[in-house]
């Protein structure tokens, strides 16, 4: 048996490799011969390839195994540009290579060559491939122009590339071609123009579309009925429906075009989008005059218009009319009608229409389900909304972003923000990635329930998941930071908003200015407002209003008025709310001459005083003791048919108590609070509130107005009224009755005592000499989680001093810093008065020196006088504030809350 030696075996096994290598070397040698030594294309190669192509010897060309390059292909196309078949063959051969693809320059040559040969189908195919290369439209256009100049061919390609760009939605590139092709002897065709116009409108570029139409007319391109329909649609979508109507009529008369149902449907839809029923009727009349038949789209637009206006009966009538016309309602029409019912809160009718749709065999879709979910959520029927969400799977429908966002919003509005967050996680599992809109809904949800720390946590989660915040996200976070009192973080976020260019409108600006002013940082707010023009954001009236209110809050009334004057110079006129604030400020800081000026000015501007305006005036007159002017303002309200509310009545009653007009105050309280209903059998209070025969006629008139004209629902007693009643009893010396009323109110479950209620009673007990009861009430406050403040302790110190127990009062003073409470001028003045009366003048002088060191002494006080207000109900510090409860201020009287702020 013959066996091969190892050397022979190796040689035998290497034969195929050696043969292949020999062939490859030959090919490379040929390719080297075809190129010059420096890598450039050799003329003889170009000549040989061109000759084979011209002779049609394509098989021989394939055998050459050409090493294609951009230079080789472009050279051949340039050489054979008058032979489209040869060019097409070499281009296709090059396109089939494994390691080579023609570049954009080759494509530009090829489309010109094919266009000249009138091979438009292949030209368009290659143009689509050229666009798919994703080269810059400007670069492609430049090369097409260069080839056009080099070859001296027809510019037909320019119109074709315009149409391709338009059809692909690349309107920016299409517009560049449209603007420049006229320079090279080619105007756009009507088909290309229509394609460009249609895609511009589809992308929402309505104003650009109208401008393109004007250019098209200037190019003397005659529009057809399709052009007119597109332009009408552009006008309608930009909100200029009347202009669309004028354009349609002018086109009809000047161009002699017969507008079709598409044009009229666009007009009807335009009027429908703005809820103009009369406009829709005019178009319908025009259709009848022109003999244009209505179709399903026509009726769908009519239903949309009626739904937009909330005229659901008319919408249903149109829906029934469709059946009489033997037209079949489609999915879209059902969806429009159901959405109308959902938006108007008629969810049962929406479900009825949906059931009818399913019954006749029309399939539901995601948009319809979204409308139903939205309707259920808005009516608070979350369970039903969840059922629709679950049934979408049965209907083979996939929830989209809008579905989830609607349901998330429903949970948030109902206060179930944690459930909404779980649904957000479920979105991720279903591969529906939450968008910034989803997170905005969640952020608003947490903010709405006051969970501001959760707002911060959600913000961090959003950023961690790679979701870019928008202006709404930032404004919500800013609001949360201000609520938490975090000034530094708010400023950092504001700088980030500016750096990212998110300040596009006044939403975030208003939140920033308002937040800073509420923190009494008006200088920072003013600085931001001064620099905001750099970012092309124009402040609105609400922006200036917030700044003006901020100055009012910090006591700088001059700057508050300066803001008003500045905005007027800018052509922005103050609202009634701003006037209300300035009126309150003029009263508070005793600029009474400005009050009348403001009232005259607001009337001259055509503004109507609101209940808040009258409340500010009544509060102001009461605060300075001018009860007659307060009465006159009340009578003006009554004459104008404006209802007196509980806050205004409480304010007047409180002022009457302060002026020792107890009978008149009681008469008003009787009309505000039905104590017989609230506390049946409470005879002592009833006797106290019974007015005497000497009651002022003006007060009687107001009381009768309250009884006769004020809806009971507007006079539901609140803490203010009850506090006024308790204060009135204390003022009248009926401390036991006040305590009994307090006890009975607690048992009625209609009253939640606050720190100010306790302060009233503590003050009453202390003044009456029952200091032990006063301290017991103080302890009761603490047990209920209500923290006593300086006014509470001032009342206790006053009671101790009145009993002559000055030592205990001093000990209580020394304990205040341990409780985190800072003594004020009232504290020291009360104790000084007690020390002087007890004969300890030296200690009184020491405290006086301490007051001076702490800056608590003003003007004449440094000479030894004590400035204590004369008109008080309980204590010069106590007043009912704008929050609905009593505020404490050492420089103001006990006062019902500022009605203007409360109502606003």
From Swiss-Prot:
PPR repeats lie at residues 154-188, 189-223, 224-254, 260-294, 295-329, 330-364, 365-399, 400-434, 435-469, 470-504, 505-539, 540-574, 575-609, 610-644, 645-679, 718-753, 754-788, 789-823, 824-858. GO terms for biological process: mitochondrial RNA processing; RNA splicing. The keyword Repeat applies. Keywords: Repeat. It comes from the Eukaryota. The keyword Calcium does not apply. GO terms for cellular component: mitochondrion. InterPro entries: Mito_RNA_Proc_CCM1 (IPR051114), Pentatricopeptide_rpt (IPR002885), TPR-like_helical_dom_sf (IPR011990). Belongs to the PPR family. P subfamily. This is Putative pentatricopeptide repeat-containing protein At1g19290. It comes from Arabidopsis thaliana.
């Amino acid at each position: 048996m013959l066996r091969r030696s190892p050397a022979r075996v190796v040689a035998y096994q290497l034969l195929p490799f050696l043969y292949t290598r020999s062939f490859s070397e030959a090919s490379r040698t040929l390719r080297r011969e075809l190129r010059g030594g420096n890598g450039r294309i050799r003329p003889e190669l170009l000549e040989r390839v061109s000759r084979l192509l011209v002779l049609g010897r394509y098989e021989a060309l394939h055998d050459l195994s050409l090493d294609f390059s951009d230079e080789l292909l472009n050279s051949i196309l340039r050489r054979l540009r008058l032979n489209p078949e040869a060019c097409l063959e070499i281009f296709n051969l090059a396109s089939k290579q494994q390691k080579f693809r023609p570049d954009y320059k080759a494509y530009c040559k090829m489309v010109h060559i094919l266009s000249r040969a009138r091979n438009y189908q292949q030209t368009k195919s290659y143009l689509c491939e050229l666009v798919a290369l994703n080269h810059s439209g400007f670069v492609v256009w430049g090369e097409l122009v260069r080839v056009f100049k080099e070859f001296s061919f027809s510019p037909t390609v320019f119109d074709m590339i315009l149409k391709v760009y338009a059809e692909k939605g690349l309107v920016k590139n299409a517009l560049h071609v449209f603007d420049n092709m006229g320079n090279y002897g080619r105007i756009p065709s009507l088909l290309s123009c229509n394609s460009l116009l249609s895609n511009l409108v589809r992308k929402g570029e309505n104003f650009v579309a109208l401008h393109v139409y004007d250019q098209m007319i200037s190019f003397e391109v005659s529009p057809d009925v399709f052009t007119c329909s597109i332009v009408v649609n552009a006008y309608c979508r930009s909100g200029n429906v009347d202009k669309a109507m004028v354009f349609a009529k002018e086109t009809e008369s000047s161009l002699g075009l017969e507008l079709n149902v598409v044009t009229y449907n666009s007009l009807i839809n335009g009027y429908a989008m703005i809820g103009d029923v009369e406009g829709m009727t005019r178009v319908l009349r025009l259709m009848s005059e022109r003999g244009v038949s209505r179709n399903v789209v026509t009726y769908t637009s009519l239903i949309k218009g009626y739904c937009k206006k909330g005229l659901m009966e008319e919408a249903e009538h149109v829906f029934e009319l469709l059946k009489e016309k033997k037209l079949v309602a489609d999915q879209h029409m059902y969806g429009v009608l159901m959405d109308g019912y959902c938006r108007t809160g008629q969810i049962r009718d929406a479900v009825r229409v949906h059931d009818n749709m399913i019954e006749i065999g029309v399939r539901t879709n995601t948009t319809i389900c979204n409308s139903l979910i939205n309707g259920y959520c808005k009516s608070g029927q979350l369970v039903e909304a969840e059922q629709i969400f679950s049934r979408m799977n049965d209907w083979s429908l996939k929830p989209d972003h809008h579905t989830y966002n609607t349901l998330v919003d429903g949970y948030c509005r109902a206060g179930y923000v944690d459930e909404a967050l779980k649904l957000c996680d479920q979105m991720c599992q279903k591969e529906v990635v939450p968008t910034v809109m989803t997170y905005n809904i969640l952020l608003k949800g947490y903010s709405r329930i006051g969970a501001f720390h959760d707002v911060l946590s959600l913000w961090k989660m959003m950023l961690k998941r790679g979701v870019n915040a928008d202006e709404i996200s930032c404004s919500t976070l800013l609001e949360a930071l201000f609520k938490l009192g975090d000034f530094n973080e708010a400023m950092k976020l504001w700088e980030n908003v500016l750096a990212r260019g998110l300040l596009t409108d006044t939403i975030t600006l208003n939140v920033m200015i308002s937040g800073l002013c509420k923190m009494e940082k008006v200088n920072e707010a003013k600085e931001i407002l001064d620099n905001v023009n750099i970012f092309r954001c124009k402040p609105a009236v609400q922006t200036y209003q917030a700044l003006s209110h901020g100055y009012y809050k910090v006591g700088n009334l001059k700057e508050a008025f300066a803001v008003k004057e500045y905005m007027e110079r800018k052509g922005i006129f103050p609202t009634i709310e701003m006037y209300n604030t300035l009126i309150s400020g003029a009263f508070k800081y005793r600029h009474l001459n400005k009050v009348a000026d403001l009232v005259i000015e607001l009337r001259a501007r055509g503004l109507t005083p609101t209940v808040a305006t009258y409340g500010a005036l009544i509060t102001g007159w009461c605060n300075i003791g001018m009860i007659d002017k307060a009465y006159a303002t009340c009578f003006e309200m009554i004459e104008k048919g404006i209802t007196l509310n509980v806050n205004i009545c409480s304010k007047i009653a409180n002022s009457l108590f302060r002026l020792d007009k107890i009978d008149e105050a009681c008469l008003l309280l009787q009309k505000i609070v039905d104590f017989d209903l609230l506390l049946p059998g409470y005879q002592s209070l009833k006797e106290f509130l019974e007015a005497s025969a000497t009651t002022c006629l003006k007060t009687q008139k107001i009381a009768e107005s309250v009884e006769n004209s004020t809806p009971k629902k507007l006079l539901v007693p609140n803490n203010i009224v009850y506090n006024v009643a308790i204060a009135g009893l204390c003022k009248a010396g009926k401390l036991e009755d006040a305590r009994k009323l307090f006890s009975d109110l607690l048992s009625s479950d209609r009253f939640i005592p606050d720190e100010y209620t306790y302060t009233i009673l503590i003050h009453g007990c202390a003044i009456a000499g029952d200091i032990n009861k006063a301290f017991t009430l103080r302890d009761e406050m603490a047990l209920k989680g209500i923290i006593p403040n300086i006014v509470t302790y001032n009342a206790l110190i006053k009671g101790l001093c009145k009993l002559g127990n000055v030592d205990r009062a001093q000990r209580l003073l020394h304990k205040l810093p341990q409780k985190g409470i800072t003594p004020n001028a009232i504290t020291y003045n009360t104790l000084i008065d007690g020390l002087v009366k007890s004969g300890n003048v030296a200690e009184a002088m020491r405290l006086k020196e301490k007051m001076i060191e702490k800056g608590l002494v003003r003007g004449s006080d440094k000479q030894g006088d004590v400035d204590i207000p004369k008109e008080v109900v309980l204590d010069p510090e106590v007043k009912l504030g704008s929050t609905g409860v009593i505020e404490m201020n050492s420089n103001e009287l006990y006062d019902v809350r500022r009605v203007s702020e409360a109502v606003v």
